[in-house]
Amino acid sequence: MSNEEFIRTQIFGTVFEITNRYTNLNPVGMGAFGLVCSATDTLTSQPVAIKKIMKPFSTSVLAKRTYRELKLLKHLRHENLICLEDIFLSPLEDIYFVTELQGTDLHRLLQTRPLEKQFVQYFLYQILRGLKYVHSAGVIHRDLKPSNILINENCDLKICDFGLARIQDPQMTGYVSTRYYRAPEIMLTWQKYNVEVDIWSAGCIFAEMIEGKPLFPGKDHVHQFSIITDLLGSPPKDVIDTICSENTLKFVTSLPHRDPVPFSSRFQNLEPDAIDLLEKMLVFDPKKRITAADALAHPYLSPYHDPTDEPIAEAKFDWNFNDADLPVDTWRVMMYSEILDFHQIGDPQINTNATFDDQVAAATVAAAEAASKQQQQQQHQTEEQTQQTIASTPPQAQVTPQQLESGANSNSNSNPSFSIGPDPANETLTNFANQADQYVSKFK
């Protein structure tokens, strides 16, 4: 698209550049990695949400994060997941994701009113239906919470914000989800967790929908663990044996033994089927936690359960890029190609269906060509500026190219000596060629 097709405006002090396809911009949310505005899509007359990714190419970490979110949004297509409808790159090289606009989120809804039983059931069913699909694709959401669950006026629910989503891998690192909804294995083991962390988060959300307030509102991770044990009791030996950190192990074993509180006592007004499902979702040992597929078949959700309409992903998500450490320019080329592939236009510089090492090799070469072209443009501009300077210099002060050449080749002390350095464009190409070899060999 040409620059004339973009409209620039300021929102919350942030430049927002969108194509003239979208009108009626209004801010609806601000996060650590982007600003979200509502808008009207003039092609469909439907409301949409437009998320601006802040400075996606400022660092390789941010570039990789944006690439991951884009790949996930392209791959995950399900009724209970937010759907990518458009994506574009602005003249300022910011990336914009366009998705469906939902009227509110579960966090806001819970602040305004208590939920009746049928709404709790229907919302939980849709959350688990979405998780079944996500987990079948080999993806963990990792940050499931009420504010990441969007709802429209028809009570249709969609899970959003896959920026933290990761590969289904038993060797994980670090704290990820918001504390209230964080599974105990993340706090205890740091490295060993899987799709079950999403089931724990969904269980916390289930309880919050029932009570209208968070179940485990920890002030910090120590307090968080403490109030979990107030309900579930001390962690079993099988869980303690998985703790990797010596300090964490000392802390857990130093705590006095606690017996679990029966859920029927804690949730006295809750029907037995709801209590049973909640108990199966909030289990200390992730290996014994119910799966999304089994939870959908639980009697509590029988009013909505339909095994013929609870699809799984057609293919596993390709996480081959996840351990790659690439320069920003390479991520940029790969992202551009993903955008072109989404729109099915143009000639992507790399084949997005190729193996990841082939994509890296192609992207590195493309980045080198772009760098070389930029270098040539800069060199051309410098030559033009030099010619303009010479043209404006008095004749007696001008130095001819022949004089420069004779000066460079002369050994006479009366003539200045000129040192001609390496060609920057050649250096750039050499560096990128070395990088290409390095990255290709890394993935062989």
UniProtKB/Swiss-Prot annotation:
- GO CC aspect terms: cytoplasm; nucleus
Could you name the domain of life of the organism this protein comes from? Eukaryota
Activity regulation (record text)? Activated by tyrosine and threonine phosphorylation.
Task: Write out the biased-composition intervals (Polar residues).
Answer: 394-405, 427-438
As annotated in the record, motif TXY runs over 173-175
Please give a single GO biological process term from the UniProt record.
stress-activated MAPK cascade
Where is the protein situated, by its record's location annotation? Cytoplasm; Nucleus
Phosphotyrosine occurs at: 175
Q: Which reaction does it catalyse?
A: L-seryl-[protein] + ATP = O-phospho-L-seryl-[protein] + ADP + H(+); L-threonyl-[protein] + ATP = O-phospho-L-threonyl-[protein] + ADP + H(+)
Please report the PTM annotation for this entry. Dually phosphorylated on Thr-173 and Tyr-175, which activates the enzyme.
- Residues bearing Phosphothreonine are 173
Q: Where is the active site?
A: 143 (proton acceptor)
InterPro entries according to UniProt: Kinase-like_dom_sf (IPR011009), MAP_kinase (IPR050117), MAP_kinase_CS (IPR003527), MAPK_p38-like (IPR008352), MAPK_Sty1/Hog1 (IPR038783), Prot_kinase_dom (IPR000719), Protein_kinase_ATP_BS (IPR017441), Ser/Thr_kinase_AS (IPR008271)
Q: Does the keyword Ribosomal protein apply?
A: no
Indicate the segments forming the Protein kinase domain, all copies.
Answer: 22-301
Co-factor(s): Mg(2+)
Q: Which UniProt keywords apply?
A: Activator, ATP-binding, Cytoplasm, Kinase, Nucleotide-binding, Nucleus, Phosphoprotein, Serine/threonine-protein kinase, Transcription, Transcription regulation, Transferase
Q: Where is this region: Disordered?
A: 371-444
Please state the protein's primary subcellular location.
cytoplasm
MF term (GO), any:
MAP kinase activity
Q: Where is the signal peptide?
A: none
Give the residues the record marks as binding ATP. 28-36, 51
Instruction: Point to the regions of Low complexity compositional bias.
Output: 371-393, 406-419
What does the entry note on its domains? The TXY motif contains the threonine and tyrosine residues whose phosphorylation activates the MAP kinases.
Record's family? Belongs to the protein kinase superfamily. Ser/Thr protein kinase family. MAP kinase subfamily. HOG1 sub-subfamily.
Name of the featured protein: Mitogen-activated protein kinase HOG1
